[in-house]
């Protein structure tokens, strides 16, 4: 009897170990099962069309096919996605876009179109339109001068921008009847599940069945292969962040409004949020803390202010996003190269001395620029604490 009890305890312990391994692997915790070598997150996903239907797959040999490609989208771009014959279902999948590679033999994902470009003072000015297919009506969204550091992501063969990153968003150029440029955007699909319990119970069943049948090396090896395969298929359920927690955090209307504002205005500070969202500082502080704990946003001391930005944003973009004034941006970029005195800055940037003086004072008040006396001149330089954003 004692022997049977001991055996049962051993079986339960084996089961718990295997279940825990699957569980942590599913939720992207930095622990992996033994013998698992294929991961489906942080991997290039390819797009092809089979019988007119878009199909995502992992790897050039299509080892892992993800179908049907349900995509969660905003209302503004839903008509564009439907034009490409994608199915839209908010309950099934998220589509995460970042700056990497995607290979496709047809036009892939459209977010916002580049209507055209022209030469202006040696810089290319991009005119953005929100509705390139004229499903409602086209409108100019913004004018943006290039080049800017890290903004152009890809170009078409004719040299025109194919994809551009601005304010932490990626805008893809729309070119009807032409193949989209390879190496455009990086996509990975994260499948959501409302409850991991069925997978855990299924794993418990497999573990018990396998261990009860035999402890022979051959069957143990097959069992591990099965668990590994199961883990590698399920690993894209949640990648790094528990999307269920993220969903719960953003179910709150106020929190979602704050989060969306930060997405659109990275580098904003508390008083700006309070003014533009018409909410008290105490309320904002509470919700901002929750968003940070959920790893949806981050905060950083920038000059004299604490600023907020999306968690996945490149910190090197923050200073230029924070400085809304183009003159201040020019002065900031100039001083990044080397310290200088007032008249040299004005001369090299072809700006009025008083204009430069006024904006330098603003930058000093923000704690972004500092000054020191060198001989009979005052030299301006970037605050050391700001320089870490550009390392």
Curated annotation (Swiss-Prot):
MF (Gene Ontology): DNA binding; DNA-binding transcription factor activity
Domain (HTH arsR-type): residue spans on this chain: 235-330
SUPFAM superfamilies, sorted: Winged helix' DNA-binding domain
Keywords: DNA-binding, Transcription, Transcription regulation
Pfam family, one: HTH_24
CDD domains with a match to the protein in the record: HTH_ARSR
Domain of life: Archaea
Cited PANTHER family: HTH ARSR-TYPE DOMAIN-CONTAINING PROTEIN, TRANSCRIPTIONAL REGULATOR, TRMB
Protein name, per record: Uncharacterized HTH-type transcriptional regulator MJ1398
């Amino acid at each position: 009897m004692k022997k049977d009890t001991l055996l049962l305890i051993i079986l339960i312990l084996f089961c718990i170990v295997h279940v825990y391994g699957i569980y942590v692997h599913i939720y992207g915790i930095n622990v992996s099962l033994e013998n698992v070598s294929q991961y489906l997150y942080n991997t290039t996903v390819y797009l092809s069309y089979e019988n007119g239907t878009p199909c995502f797959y992992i790897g050039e040999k299509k080892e892992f096919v993800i179908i049907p490609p349900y995509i969660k989208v905003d209302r503004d771009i839903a008509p564009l996605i439907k034009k490409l014959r994608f199915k839209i279902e908010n309950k099934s999948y998220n589509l995460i876009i970042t700056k990497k590679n995607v290979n496709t033999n047809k036009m892939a994902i459209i977010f916002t179109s580049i209507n055209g470009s022209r030469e202006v003072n040696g810089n290319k000015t991009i005119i953005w339109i929100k509705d390139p297919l004229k499903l409602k009506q086209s409108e100019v969204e913004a004018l943006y001068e290039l080049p800017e550091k890290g903004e152009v992501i890809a170009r078409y063969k004719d040299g025109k921008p194919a994809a551009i990153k601005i304010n932490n968003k990626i805008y893809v150029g729309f070119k009807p009847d032409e193949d989209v440029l390879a190496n455009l955007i990086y996509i990975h699909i994260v499948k959501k599940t409302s409850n991991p319990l069925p997978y855990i119970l299924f794993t418990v069943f497999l573990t018990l069945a396998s261990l009860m049948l035999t402890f022979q090396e051959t069957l143990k090896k097959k069992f591990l292969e099965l668990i590994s395969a199961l883990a590698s298929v399920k690993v894209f359920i949640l990648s790094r962040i528990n999307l269920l927690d993220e969903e719960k955090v953003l179910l709150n209307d106020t929190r979602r409004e704050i989060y969306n504002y930060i997405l659109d205005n990275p580098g904003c500070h508390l008083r700006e949020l309070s003014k533009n969202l018409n909410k008290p500082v105490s309320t904002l502080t509470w919700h901002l803390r929750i968003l940070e704990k959920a790893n949806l946003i981050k905060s950083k001391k920038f000059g004299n202010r604490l600023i907020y930005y999306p968690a996945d944003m490149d910190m090197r973009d923050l200073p230029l996003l924070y400085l809304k004034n183009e003159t201040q941006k020019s002065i900031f970029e100039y001083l990044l190269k080397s310290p200088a005195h007032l008249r040299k800055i004005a001369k090299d940037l072809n700006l009025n001395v008083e204009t430069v003086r006024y904006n330098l004072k603003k930058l000093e008040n923000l704690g972004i620029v500092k000054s020191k006396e060198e001989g009979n001149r005052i030299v301006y330089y970037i605050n050391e604490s700001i320089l870490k954003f550009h390392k």
